[in-house]
Amino acid sequence: MDVYPPRRQGLPRARSPGGSSRGSPSVSCSRLRQVQSILTQSSKSRPDGILCILGIDSRYNEGCRELANYLLFGLYNQNTSDFEKTGFSEEVLDDVIILIKSDSVHLYCNPVNFRYLLPYVAHWRNLHFHCMTENEYEDEEAAEEFKITSFVDMVRDCSRIGIPYSSQGHLQIFDMFVVEKWPIVQAFALEGIGGDGFFTMKYELQDVSLNLWNVYSKMDPMSLESLLSDDLVAFEHQWTSFFANFDTEIPFLLELSESQAGEPFRSYFSHGMISSHITENSPNRQPFVLFGNHSTRENLNAGNFNFPSEGHLVRSTGPGGSFAKHMVAQCVSPKGPLACSRTYFFGATHVPYLGGDSKLPKKTEQIRLLSQIYAAVIEAVLAGIACYAKTSSLTKAKEVAEQTLGSGLDSFELIPFKAALRSKMTFHIHAVNNQGRIVPLDSEDSLSFVKTACMAVYDIPDLLGGNGCLGSVVFSESFLTSQILVKEKDGTVTTETSSVVLTAAVPRFCSWLVEDNEVKLSEKTQQAVRGDESFLGTYLTGGEGAYLYSSNLQSWPEEGNVHFFSSGLLFSHCRHRSIIISKDHMNSISFYDGDSTSTVAALLIDFKSSLLPHLPVHFHGSSNFLMIALFPKSKIYQAFYSEVFSLWKQQDNSGISLKVIQEDGLSVEQKRLHSSAQKLFSALSQPAGEKRSSLKLLSAKLPELDWFLQHFAISSISQEPVMRTHLPVLLQQAEINTTHRIESDKVIISIVTGLPGCHASELCAFLVTLHKECGRWMVYRQIMDSSECFHAAHFQRYLSSALEAQQNRSARQSAYIRKKTRLLVVLQGYTDVIDVVQALQTHPDSNVKASFTIGAITACVEPMSCYMEHRFLFPKCLDQCSQGLVSNVVFTSHTTEQRHPLLVQLQSLIRAANPAAAFILAENGIVTRNEDIELILSENSFSSPEMLRSRYLMYPGWYEGKLNAGSVYPLMVQICVWFGRPLEKTRFVAKCKAIQSSIKPSPFSGNIYHILGKVKFSDSERTMEVCYNTLANSLSIMPVLEGPTPPPDSKSVSQDSSGQQECYLVFIGCSLKEDSIKDWLRQSAKQKPQRKALKTRGMLTQQEIRSIHVKRHLEPLPAGYFYNGTQFVNFFGDKTDFHPLMDQFMNDYVEEANREIEKYNQELEQQEYHDLFELKP
């Protein structure tokens, strides 16, 4: 349980309006891995780390800021006013230093910006925070000194450092002396707290800007979201402006020039190119608008940035100087990968049905011919895109495109012209990076780039017998592909692909009426159907806001006005003008509204082939089918029900009546169209005042987008294969069948992990004692006498032996016991939990692997044992709480005090790293709630769909054991020493309690943080279990409980090699040495007596001399001496305070003392003394 209510993940932060969101942890980790890949390239000159310094400390270097924004999803794309909203100065928020190493990250920040950065970085693997506490940060001088020492510590193990010197489009000549002038780099040379010398002399610096630009140019889910919500919106806006030019100039359309028509594209491109600092002269990346016969191959491939002159008008660019029949247009994003080209028409591509047989005039036939060629080109390009998405082969895509073009021409009965047209056709696909640069299609990174597929049919002759050239037809789309590698049951690897056409929402078909007689014909059509004696019968109702859909996959719905008559309907559009559908042309007409007022009402029209000449060419589909969608709550929706519905249900002279159908009566194609209309209605009907989501609207326009985003979220993370059985779960198509997931005969593994001193062992003992009735328990603990915390090979051998032991039992017992057996894995050390998972996944025996399954992983956290100093965490502290792996986090101290600051702070940190984890309070490992115990002993938490998907996204390659967990930093050593002699309890306790005062700051070398083991003290015969936690300064000495122990214990292997030594202590600390540990421990044992040195007169103390005098001053005096009561006097009158024979007395004393010393030394030599680590005989 949480100490406080679970907060929504992510803390408030300043962010520019409309800026990118916080981003998903998987994309964040993927971006970090992309940057780290620069450090793992097979190059002798590759750097050991990439240094990113923000703010004034790097003199606001743009390259560093760009890298930070890439990793932090644009957090520092803010202006001054945004920073002011936070209440903190820019200098405080920019106070960040990031050092990226190949398998870890060091991050310096301050307590203020820590909370802004945390949601972005908490899930990074092997993350090391260099940050002060709030109280420490109040001392400005200490804070500055801490920053310098942190910077020195961060780069200590490097020799070659990469600098992101330049930002994209602003390449600068790298100058390490400029870097040396950066304030924090200058401070590196300070005496006392600095790094003992100049930074640029101690480290080799190199510019990694170009490497990073290649990383930035790759598409991932976040950059795709930005592309869709920002770049694509701006791109489509240019087309909207382009259409507006034509729609407003309809009365004067013939006088419109190419230059005027292309003004939106030209301004958009030229202004963007100026600000992008990118020079791209490829003709494929140039905008253009060309009318009629001016759209020749020569003009299209000229690559000239300037638009043609004002002299090329619609009026004069057709065959023989007549008006143009069509135009080709291309818009190009100047700072992004988007580009698409279209062919639009001047004049009607169809003749409205007016009740009799109407023949197309010759000029309309030319337009119809061009539109049919164009429709075939569109189909060919889309077929080529689909083929390329599946095969990644340009050659195959070109073949498919050419075949599709041929079959398209056949379908329009253009067989006589096929040979002439195919000889003038070209098809190509270009890959474009995020900055709009064309890159090789066959490069290894091309999968992550947007591509543009284009087909052009150049210089089309007047195929209807006229002279001259009609011009060219061009169509292109920007698309993105996604490819997931899938591992089948037999071990083979196949691919699952998906693609989305990004520019598909730009109208593919459009036409404008330019000649007076065409406009008059359109007006005549409107008047004819509204007349009293109209062939469509009586006018019923009409209105705007209807959408016309066709079965043609290449066309999009057209919004227009619909007018209903007793014998048909009229759909009018501002560009396509009138489309008349009489009941005489209908085979049937159905109606579907889902019996709900929130469902789009759909008129489903199955029409006869005789209607085709009276439909625009893009409404010709594989099946003769149209759908008119009426949105709920619209006026036309209500009018249809009141004026049309009842009347049309009655059969008239045509024999056609409206048939109401249910959902099961819809064909697959009809369901697809209705679903698309429903999504569009949902996107357009946001509540008043709520900003319409551009992504939601785009998703309605691009039905395949939602599926592609799911697919791309998986494929963009890594090219490691996904298991076939897991793929539906990853794509959120299905959930794992729980009855299938945990088979009854599998042994459930419950993993409890944590740092030393986290009370994981106590929790383990509690669980085993409490749940003996659940069946048989096996307990695995890590090997103690090893420098590594976890041995995968040892764990795998243990699993094999445990399974073998079960199989050796009788069949009846085995069936019972295997159902009841649980394995509790207790790992108390600096173990990365992913290593344990991968050890099971990569077990060499597939039968063993199949016999065990992980139920849940629980991490124990002792708040007092998390920080080495300040907010610098112990190694693997956050990694032991990783999302996708760990289901529960148990806090084992400070749980009795309400909202203890340390506990709250750690919960906030871990919640950012693992938002889905359950928090459990268990003082000293004792769980008090039944529901918490159920969480820890869960049988399926680890294998839930959410956890499985998170594992694949966060740890690519985990299933096959390919993920490198990274090294432990700082290096923590685990030294186990065995001995057979008792310790002196008082000396041992005193030595332990003195450790805390000797703890050294970074780099922490020689620090002892934990002592644990089993020993005997000289005052008792009982074996005692001791545990000492240095940071908490807590020492526990408890008798070892006698009784059966969980079989088999891994320590038995170690004991065999230790002979008769039955006591051991494990010392855990930083860069410890065994000799030093043994010397420390010897001082806790009974000390070996030392030989006494023989005395000399010079060694006698004044006290000893006085004692000798007092003892012998009454002895007889030699001749010539007498005692006067106070002094000794000779016959010469000399006086002395001491007896005249004092020298003899002292010699006698020394001689006697030396006899005693010699006797003592002789007895000492005869005594047998054993060193603490000496084996017993």
UniProtKB/Swiss-Prot annotation:
TM annotation in the entry: none
Domain of life: Eukaryota
Low complexity composition-biased segments: 11-27
InterPro entries: C20orf194-like, CobW_C_DAAF9, DAAF9_N
Annotated region described as Disordered, given as residue ranges: 1-27
Function of the protein: May act as an effector for ARL3.
Assembly and interaction partners: Interacts with ARL3.
Name of the protein: Dynein axonemal assembly factor 9
Species per Swiss-Prot/TrEMBL record: Homo sapiens
Top-level taxonomy: Eukaryota, Metazoa, Chordata, Craniata, Vertebrata
Gene: DNAAF9
